[in-house]
């Protein structure tokens, strides 16, 4: 299976825009042929190789409008897997692992398009959760485990803090866009953020997670913001006191 993905890997990272565009269209058709539960699945390694190529496909794209269009196209590739829960979870995981791995190599001139891609993928993830049903605890559990394991990991020192900050900054923005009726299981969605407040070793990350939980828009989902602010600050202060005590123990 890996050999079949090799042409896409080379063409998607080409400096020729027409070749990249053609390769992306061919890739969509290829992925559709492997999207059903009865088809031969792509391995985790195949998905990581594809995402590395897609990462550099965006890397090579210039002009902001074209970059945004491509980022949206990359997010829409997720829809190919809509009927296969196993692969769609693996697809999201490969995306986040790729972004985390390549983050340090993104220069300042290219950062904006990747920040936009991440925004697209946070939104797409929530859209997929909505399409599966907000009451689908099994799927939601697996999806938010991916977020908690990679971009919002509390303990993994290999995850860049910059990635954590950006996801926290846009988390409620994208939830608001997807769940206009405020029907989503908000506590399940906020669980990765709460885990950061309680378990992260980084003080700045903890504070930023607390700010996310104190977003006034969360009132629309029934979150008690006043209590949340106090509770978050108490947890942050307690965690920092424990760290200070440990330093002098």
Task: Give residue spans per PLM region.
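Eukaryote-skewed repeat-based solenoidal scaffolds used as protein-protein interaction platforms
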Residues: 60, 71-186
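Extended alpha-solenoid helical-repeat scaffolds
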Residues: 12, 18, 25-33, 77, ...
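Short, flexible/disordered secondary-structure transition segments
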Residues: 19, 37-38, 65, 106, ...
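HEAT/HEAT-like alpha-solenoid repeats
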Residues: 2-6, 36-55, 88-99, 125-148, ...
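Charged/polar, solvent-exposed surface patches and flexible loops
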Residues: 10, 25, 29, 52-56, ...
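Short coil/turn segments at helix-helix junctions and helix-capping linkers
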Residues: 7-19, 53-66, 101-110, 154-159, ...
């Amino acid at each position: 299976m890996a050999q079949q993905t090799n042409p896409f890997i080379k063409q998607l990272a080409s400096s020729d825009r027409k070749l990249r565009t053609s390769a992306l269209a061919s890739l969509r058709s290829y992925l559709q042929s492997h999207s059903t539960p009865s088809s031969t699945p792509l391995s985790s390694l195949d998905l990581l190789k594809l995402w590395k190529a897609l990462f550099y496909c965006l890397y090579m794209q210039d002009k902001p409008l074209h970059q945004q269009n491509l980022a949206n196209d990359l997010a829409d590739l997720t829809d190919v897997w809509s009927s296969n829960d196993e692969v769609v979870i693996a697809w999201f995981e490969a995306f986040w692992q790729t972004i985390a791995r390549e983050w340090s190599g993104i220069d300042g001139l290219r950062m904006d398009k990747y920040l936009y891609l991440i925004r697209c993928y946070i939104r797409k993830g929530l859209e997929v959760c909505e399409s599966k049903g907000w009451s689908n605890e099994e799927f939601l559990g697996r999806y938010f485990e991916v977020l908690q394991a990679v971009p919002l990991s509390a303990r993994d020192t290999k995850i860049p803090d910059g990635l954590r900050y950006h996801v926290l900054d846009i988390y409620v923005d994208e939830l608001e866009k997807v769940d206009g009726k405020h029907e989503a299981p908000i506590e399940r969605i906020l669980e990765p953020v709460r885990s950061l407040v309680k378990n992260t070793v980084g003080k700045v990350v903890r504070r930023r997670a607390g700010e996310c939980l104190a977003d006034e828009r969360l009132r629309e989902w029934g979150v008690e913001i006043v209590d949340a602010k106090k509770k978050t600050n108490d947890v942050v202060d307690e965690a920092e006191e424990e760290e200070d005590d440990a330093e002098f123990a």
